């Protein structure tokens, strides 16, 4: 699914950015603060260092909010806030669930092309793991971690204040997990690397 979605979004953004180069500039056509409210699908690409066993992490749909501050017409910083719950399994063994809180700060570059305004961004996230449930084992412990974020999206103006938003982010996220299986304690390096696809509405503050 990712192999289809990512090239499609990149081609769409490229077409809008080419149009943006030819579009007339309006230096007053931005607000210092913006907020977006999205429904987002969080699609992990899990991996681990266990031989002969693959970890499986569930996809989930969540509400997401971000606040964007524009330094100039084109350059901005975006703080993304959301929390998500995932079920975890290894080869059919239920490892319960865990909640993730990954506040993410991206630096963005916004193109301007009439009512369509594509953007790209990159930044960092700090992921906090909480609310662990151990499932069929004695205990699970997830270590908080720092990772990178890459982003592309499009805003479409509905009027001078409100706009629609399509946003795609790739988080490079991994964690050290300690599995207490009762008779043994197993350290595991787990890659989560979620693709986050969001659709919603924004407002210029």
Sequence positions of predicted segments:
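Cleavable N-terminal export/targeting peptides
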Residues: 1-31
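Gram-negative (and chloroplast) outer-membrane scaffold detector with strong preference
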Residues: 23, 34, 39-43, 66-135, ...
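N-terminal targeting signals for Sec/Tat export/insertion, comprising classic cleavable signal peptides
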Residues: 30-56
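Outer-membrane beta-barrel translocator domains and adjoining extracellular loop/strand segments
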Residues: 46-53, 87-95, 130-139, 176-184
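Hydrophobic alpha-helical segments typical of transmembrane helices
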Residues: 63-66, 150
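A charged, solvent-exposed segment within the mature domains of Sec-exported extracytoplasmic proteins
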Residues: 121, 131-172
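Hydrophobic secondary-structure block in the mid-to-C-terminal portion of proteins
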Residues: 157-205
């Amino acid at each position: 699914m990712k192999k289809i979605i990512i090239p499609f979004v990149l081609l769409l953004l490229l077409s809008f950015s080419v149009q943006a180069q030819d579009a007339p500039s309006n230096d007053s056509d931005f607000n210092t603060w913006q907020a977006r409210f999205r429904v987002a699908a969080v699609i992990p690409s899990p991996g681990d260092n266990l031989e002969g066993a693959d970890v499986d992490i569930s996809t989930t749909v969540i509400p997401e909010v971000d606040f964007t501050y524009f330094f100039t017409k084109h350059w901005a910083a975006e703080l993304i806030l959301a929390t998500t719950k995932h079920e975890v399994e290894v080869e059919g063994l239920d490892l319960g669930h865990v909640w993730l809180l990954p506040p993410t700060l991206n630096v963005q570059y916004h193109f301007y092309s009439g009512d369509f305004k594509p953007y790209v961004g990159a930044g960092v996230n700090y992921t906090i793991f909480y609310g662990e449930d151990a499932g069929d084992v004695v205990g699970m412990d997830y270590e908080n971690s720092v990772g990178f974020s890459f982003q592309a999206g499009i805003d479409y103006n509905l009027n001078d204040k409100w706009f629609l938003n399509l946003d795609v982010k790739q988080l490079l996220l991994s964690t050290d997990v300690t599995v207490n299986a009762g008779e043994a304690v197993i350290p595991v390096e787990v890659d989560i690397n979620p693709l986050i696809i969001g659709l919603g509405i924004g407002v210029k503050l």
